[in-house]
Amino acid sequence: SPVIFAGGTFNGHPLTMVAGITILKHLKENQEEIYPYLHEQGNRIANEINEFCSSNNIAAQMMNAGSMMHLIFSGDTIDSARDIGRSKIEKEFYLHLLGHNVIVPGIHLAFISFAHKPDIVDKVIDAFKKSFEDLREDGYL
């Protein structure tokens, strides 16, 4: 019989498969509550960060699609991936953000989940603002 390789830490593991099916059922059963909340909180983070950057003359913008966000260090209009560049400021920003207890993966896409309630979202927004202030103190802005 043919063998199928499924690479990854838990790919194809029966327990992982049950957990995946269970969460998908939960998301479907609660979609009227979960997805609007995620979009609302993702938009809130992006809007507050963008307002902060605009009012503090910081050339950065938070782009989001619901609960997925990406901070771009440019004040210019972003039309394609070619408009996004990596900079030393970006590296320093994420180090400061980590120092304020917010972890963003190396690809610099931030995500929130339904577990991130408004008080946690407030802390995330505050950490972003403090990280921008840290950059300014360090002479990057």
Regions found by a protein language model. Name each.
Residues 1-141:
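Conserved N-terminal phosphate-binding loop of PLP-dependent enzymes in the Aspartate aminotransferase
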